[in-house]
Amino acid sequence: MKTKEIVDDVTMKRAITRITYEIIERNKQLDNVVLAGIKTRGVFLARRIQERLHQLEGLDLPIGELDIKPFRDDMRVEEDTTLMSVDITGKDVILIDDVLYTGRTIRAAIDNLVSLGRPARVSLAVLVDRGHRELPIRADYVGKNIPTSSVEEIVVEVVEVDGRDRVSIIDST
């Protein structure tokens, strides 16, 4: 297996800043926006976007943590550790995740989200879009488009979990 770093910590920070600026530009009513990070790394990315929004606009947007495991079609998990302290009904919810691949994680996140309330709008922000969709899902905000083959894997590391920020591609051939 070959591993190659394709995004370093500086590039990751720039991608998160770019996503944040796009969120500001596309959302006229930022006070109606709720950020929802998909566990695990999506939560930390959501917190970073929340921090940048505070720095740039002086806003403290609410943030929630979505646990998609109970909503996946390939797992059987009873415990749901979702933490959503704000009512999302009528809100513009931005789902945030590290990698968009087949779309199945996002489908599960949307299922979880609508079980909590009825948002006015749901959009998607991802650090990396690697292609290979199995469901008709696309990201509204993308940090990096990194096309991959079926034998490659994208690994996102964040300092809060992994001790460093980077994105690597692993070739399993």
Swiss-Prot record:
Disulfide bridge map: none
EC number: 2.4.2.9
Single GO term (MF): uracil phosphoribosyltransferase activity
Gene Ontology biological process terms, A to Z: DNA-templated transcription termination
Gene3D superfamilies associated with the record: 3.40.50.2020
Coiled-coil segments: none
Keywords: Glycosyltransferase, RNA-binding, Transcription, Transcription regulation, Transcription termination, Transferase
Residues bound to substrate: 40-41, 97-105, 130
InterPro entries noted in UniProt: PRibTrfase_dom (IPR000836), PRTase-like (IPR029057), PyrR (IPR023050), PyrR_bifunctional (IPR050137)
Keyword flag Kinase: no
Positions of short motif PRPP-binding: 93-105
Reactions this protein catalyses: UMP + diphosphate = 5-phospho-alpha-D-ribose 1-diphosphate + uracil
Pfam families: Pribosyltran (PF00156)
The family this protein is said to belong to: Belongs to the purine/pyrimidine phosphoribosyltransferase family. PyrR subfamily.
Role this protein plays: Regulates transcriptional attenuation of the pyrimidine nucleotide (pyr) operon by binding in a uridine-dependent manner to specific sites on pyr mRNA. This disrupts an antiterminator hairpin in the RNA and favors formation of a downstream transcription terminator, leading to a reduced expression of downstream genes. Also displays a weak uracil phosphoribosyltransferase activity which is not physiologically significant.
Subunit structure: Homodimer and homohexamer; in equilibrium.
Designated name of the protein: Bifunctional protein PyrR
Organism for this UniProt entry: Streptococcus pyogenes serotype M1
